[in-house]
Amino acid sequence: DIKLFDRGFDFYAPQTFEDENGRRILIGWMGIPDADYTNPTEEAGWQHALTIPRELSVRDGKLIQEPIEELKQLRSEDKAVCTFCYGQTIIMQNAIYEAVVDFKRCREMVMTLREGITLSYKDNILTLNLGVYGSGRSTRKVRLEKLEHLQIFADTSSLEIFVNHGEEVLQQESTIIMEDY
């Protein structure tokens, strides 16, 4: 079977290297150079970005991509946002955040990652929906055996979503610039 490294919209030209501890690290370009959409960052004088560095490994015959441990050193404080209940919608309140969500027997959920952008799970399908902000690129879907864990990194111009401890990854360079609210 062929497996995509990243199920998101803008993953391009990944490069890997081995660090001094023997870890295989991947960094990709977050942006497609010949795409027919534009990003508001162009008005600010820049276009595209690099993904979060990902440590590559193999677990149970599957390629795993997890954010490097060093990112934990950048955290400033923990905030408990909510307890997730069946049928509840989670709405993230900031433009810049790292969210870690663990699920027990999740059958269905919806998260609003930012205004107009949702992540949903139903019938074993995880869907990232950009809505009107996708510039014609509206959804990405991935079939999962089950949803147990999400780790989401968001800043004012991108989202990176690590599913089930790196079994799947989705990223998106934003077609909108979010103000921290």
Language model region names:
Residues 5-181:
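Beta-rich accessory regions
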Residues 1:
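Active-site neighborhood of glycoside hydrolase catalytic domains
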